[in-house]
């Protein structure tokens, strides 16, 4: 539920490496 400061409209979350996932075109962590 914490925004990772990254969008995932066109590309996947690079921050997925630290546990972030794409939700509603924005990368979130928990």
From Swiss-Prot:
Keyword Disulfide bond in record: yes
Cross-link (Cyclopeptide (Gly-Asn)): 1-30
Superkingdom as given in the UniProt entry: Eukaryota
Post-translational modifications: This is a cyclic peptide.
UniProt cross-references to Pfam families, sorted A to Z: Cyclotide
GO terms of biological process kind: defense response
Keywords from the named record: Disulfide bond, Knottin, Plant defense
Family: Belongs to the cyclotide family. Bracelet subfamily.
Biological role stated in the UniProt entry: Probably participates in a plant defense mechanism.
Protein name: Cycloviolacin-O17
Organism whose genome encodes this protein: Viola odorata
């Amino acid at each position: 539920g914490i925004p990772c400061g990254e969008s995932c409209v066109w590309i996947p979350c690079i921050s997925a490496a630290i546990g972030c996932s794409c939700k509603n075109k924005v990368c979130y962590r928990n």
